[in-house]
Amino acid sequence: MFENLSERLERSFKILKGEGRITEVNVAETLKDVRKALLDADVNYKVAKTFTDTVKNKAIGQDVLTSIHPSQLMVKIVHDELTALMGGETADINYEGHPAVILMSGLQGSGKTTFSSKLANYLKKKKNRNPLLVACDVYRPAAIDQLKVLGESIGVPVYSEPESKNPVQIALNAIKEAKAKSYNLVIIDTAGRLAIDEAMMQEIAAIKEAVNPTETLFVVDSMTGQDAVNTAKEFNDRLDFTGVILTKLDGDTRGGAALSIRTVVTKPIKFIGTGEKMEAIDQFHPSRMADRILGMGDVVSLVERAQEQFDEEQAKKLQRKLARNQFDFNDFLAQIEQIKKMGNIKDLLGMIPGIGKAVKDMDIDDNAFKGVEAIIRSMTPKERANPDIINNSRRERIARGSGTTLQEVNKLMKQFEQIRKTMKTVAGGKFPGMMPGMGRR
């Protein structure tokens, strides 16, 4: 996430490394580099200029303590201004109402339907809401089917009227259904288009007027950069939405949309999508995002994700087994499942301070876990519970059953032994660590 921008900014700050104090000359030189980095990241030109002008005014004339290097002070100023640029404070979503109604808008391909389901799942699990998803895309039958499949996967019902071509009436009927069946949250997925057109705008505006939503959220693909900002402005001019959702942020190495959109539309970014899984959704925290952009990681979000998957009873059981050196492949498989639920592995590593740059060019693939899982699931229950009995003939059978090679099985057995030894020494810890060699090709 934003790796290219992070690297460029880090290079810019090196200009001040050899300086004893901040001057107008070295600040100008540094900020010239910073502005170019922002523009190359597809940040809006006016936003980039205003940002660097503000940083310059705050930096020049600053008294630098002897214990603080000029480059450190510049990083602090840039961090504070990046935070302000992205909204300053975390913007909560309004889910109060009987029912609360959230209207989703955006172009086709922005990830709107998927995010509607993610949001329903998030509010159901974290805020104890009882959501109803509504399929109001009357032009694409596949969109209704997609929402139904996603809804079923998270245990959330989907209201649809496949024969109807009136999205306004569908939305109104869905709200009646929600009231009748005590759903306290309605999330309306609307039709998208490949480009903005008048008919699309009139339709979504009519739905908004009819249902009077608690929130109107604009979903945008962050990887489209400046186009995302321009589209957001057009939607906001017509819809006056209440917040922005940035999807596909895990694949965005530049960051132009995240850094520009708040200033251009004066509406907060409320949530971000960070992967394909239903759990790959985070509330947007400007300060934490500034940390990540500046290569400081985001330990708070990492710990929060771990806590979400933390099962106290399971942890106590594992701790007892570790103390007795009884860690087996059943425990190993459970740890893999926990880590997978936390999100994209490369994204997780990027949250650790100093690691983001190191993993930037690594080929880290979540699918690598599939081979490991296949090997473990090809073991008998007795073998999983007693790894020491897995001799060479058993390994050959496991390799055949899992569609892998004997070498891959041997490699996993060796890794498992290393993990077992390591985990015994840290038996008092509760945080599931990254397993040596896992996920890397």
What function would you assign to each model-found segment?
Residues 4, 11, 33, 77-84, ...:
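Alpha-helical scaffold segments in soluble metabolic enzymes
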Residues 8-136, 143-164, 170-190:
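Primarily NTPase-proximal linker/entry elements flanking Walker-type ATP/GTP-binding cores
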Residues 141-147, 228-231:
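Short, glycine/polar-rich helix-capping loops at beta-to-alpha or helix-loop-helix junctions
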Residues 109-110, 139-141, 165-167, 192-196, ...:
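Short, small-residue-enriched loops and turns at beta-alpha junctions
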Residues 16, 42, 78, 107, ...:
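Residue-level signature of catalytic and energy-coupling elements of molecular machines
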Residues 2-19, 288-441:
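Long amphipathic alpha-helical segments used for membrane anchoring, targeting, substrate engagement
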Residues 172-175, 179, 183, 195, ...:
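Conserved phosphate-handling catalytic cores of large alpha/beta enzymes
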